[in-house]
Amino acid sequence: MEFPSKFTHKKMVGIIPLDGFKNDWRLPYSPYFAPIAEGLTLIDNAVLQCAFAGCRQIFILCNEKDVKLLRHNLGEWVEDPNWWWKKTVDHQAAYRVQIPIYYIRMSEKDKRQRGSAAWGIISTAMTANRMAGFASKWTAPAKFFVTFPWTATPFWDIGKHRATSVARKKVFYSHEGRSAWEGEYLPFTFDQDDLRKIKKNFRKKNTLTYRMVADYEPGSNSWFERLPKEEQRSGRFFTVQQLVEPINKNKLFEIELNKYYNVFTWENYKMAVADYSFKRPKSRYLKAGQESRILQRIGVNESE
């Protein structure tokens, strides 16, 4: 289904890729479950960044083995902070908005052939489009907000710029002159036109097992040759910096962040924890204790 380039709505969907990274901290659990503050993990902080930025839905690309733990810790929705303290209504609780969280995975074929975080972002955006397409192509996201568990930025700082990130067509976040275009794990947004561009760029640069060396000849194998093993399936090593190359950075609105740590490495993670700038919100935006945050299934009674 071909999705429109322009929408009358401003629906923004959050994308958090957890799969496709090669950092191994030698922990008994995945690195994004590491705490950055008391009661706040790296993935919690990323989900809150999406919520504070103004996302209507959040898609988390993860390993299948981690889904159960993620659903246990996060549930299937997070509160929209913008509606939590609405003062224009008499009963605040009745008008609160829940942002659904969807857990998806890369197919085994994708993991073998192009299993990078960059392709994970593309496939997650396509999944969001497919889900919207079941209703109508006009319900597809107008733009996508990408953040990472390695983006150690206080979610409050993202929330300060919510009006800008929602109203502007596209934005990107920077710190000290660096952004995703310089290889940092900083948030950025892209629209449907950009999605088509980055897909085309990925497929153009991604190598397969063989390459063509001459014109196609039926019944002959002289027109292709096998690539060296280290050059095969280059999409597996595609970086986020390569992903955003087709997007013209100068056409995006820049938002400067005061604080940011790239916690992809253990050394930077220790620096972020030692900063004491990260705190779990007192308001119950996230799942707390034994609270059940399971979305009601359509056509299914709660007792079933």
Regions found by a protein language model. Give the residues of each.
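Short acidic, glycine/proline-enriched helix-loop-strand junctions
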Residues: 2-14, 36-40, 67-102
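A short acidic (Asp/Glu
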Residues: 27, 69-73, 156-159
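Conserved beta-loop-beta/alpha segment of the NTase-like Rossmann-fold superfamily
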Residues: 80, 87-204, 298
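Catalytic-core segments of class I nucleotidyltransferases/pyrophosphorylases
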Residues: 136-138, 153-165, 177-303
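N-terminal donor/sugar-recognition subdomains of glycan-related enzymes
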Residues: 1-11, 90, 133, 142-143, ...
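Cofactor-binding loop segments of dinucleotide-utilizing enzymes, especially the Rossmann-like FAD-
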Residues: 17-19, 63, 149
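N-terminal nucleotide-binding beta1-loop-alpha1 segment
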Residues: 1-34, 40, 45, 51-58, ...
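Short internal beta-strands
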Residues: 57-63, 173-174
